[in-house]
């Protein structure tokens, strides 16, 4: 425990809270260009090939974004919109790519939760 004189000389400094999505810089979404589209495997109890893309954002950040839904049309140089939201079983993936925005197509034959996957209303 510091003395009062020590506190006068050097006051207590509040710890800065760590931001969960620093690359967005307080924005709800950011635009970026895919530099690499690939699959990766999740952490221990789960098993799959999760689709992810490395994205260079307009502010210069390079982040990894998860591509949700079944099937996608993304390749290198595709322009995508990114939002915050991590994938619990993929270390280092703290962003989601928005479906149905810019170069990313919506999920085909999607009947429920369509807005989350950029799917149009079926006729």
From Swiss-Prot:
Any one of the GO CC terms: small ribosomal subunit
Gene Ontology MF terms in the entry: rRNA binding; structural constituent of ribosome; tRNA binding
Keywords per UniProt: Methylation, Ribonucleoprotein, Ribosomal protein, RNA-binding, rRNA-binding, tRNA-binding
Subunit structure as annotated in this protein's UniProt entry: Part of the 30S ribosomal subunit. Contacts proteins S8 and S17. May interact with IF1 in the 30S initiation complex.
HAMAP family: Ribosomal_uS12_B (MF_00403_B)
Function: With S4 and S5 plays an important role in translational accuracy.
Protein's UniProt name: Small ribosomal subunit protein uS12
Species: Afipia carboxidovorans (strain ATCC 49405 / DSM 1227 / KCTC 32145 / OM5)
GN (gene name): rpsL
């Amino acid at each position: 425990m510091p003395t009062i004189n020590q506190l006068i000389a050097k006051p207590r400094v509040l710890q800065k809270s760590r931001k969960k999505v620093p690359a967005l810089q307080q924005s709800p979404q950011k635009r970026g260009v895919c530099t690499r589209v690939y699959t990766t495997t999740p952490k221990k109890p789960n098993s799959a090939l999760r689709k992810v893309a490395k994205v260079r954002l307009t502010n210069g950040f390079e982040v990894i974004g998860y591509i949700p839904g079944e099937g996608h049309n993304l390749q290198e140089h595709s322009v995508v919109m990114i939002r915050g939201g991590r994938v619990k079983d993929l270390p280092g993936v703290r962003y989601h790519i928005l479906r149905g925005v810019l170069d990313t197509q919506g999920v085909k034959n999607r009947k429920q939760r369509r807005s989350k996957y950029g799917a149009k209303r079926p006729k």
